[in-house]
Amino acid sequence: MQASIIICACAIPNKAWVRRDGKKYSDVDVAIAMDHLVLAATDVGLGTCWIAAFDPAAAREVLGLPDSVEPIAFTPLGYAANQLGNRRRKTMMEIVKHERWQD
């Protein structure tokens, strides 16, 4: 991929909606926004991929993020250098559970 743009999706946890049990939804909200970005990019022929394995402190420093802003994920945005071949996908039976979790 020739990515001329790399997007860092960030959250502001202290402004997030909070569920009754105290769970802040900032990471979920960022994931929803990132998913929409990936779908829109794919729709116009651009390639993307989620990058969540990064050093948050280094990202904060490079991007000049204040302490109140949390980097959640990155994605490059560009045109694929070549087409990937078909990969084996898991079947629905491998990933969907019915009514109760069972291994």
Outline where the language-model segments fall.
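Short, electropositive alpha-helical surface patch
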Residues: 59-72
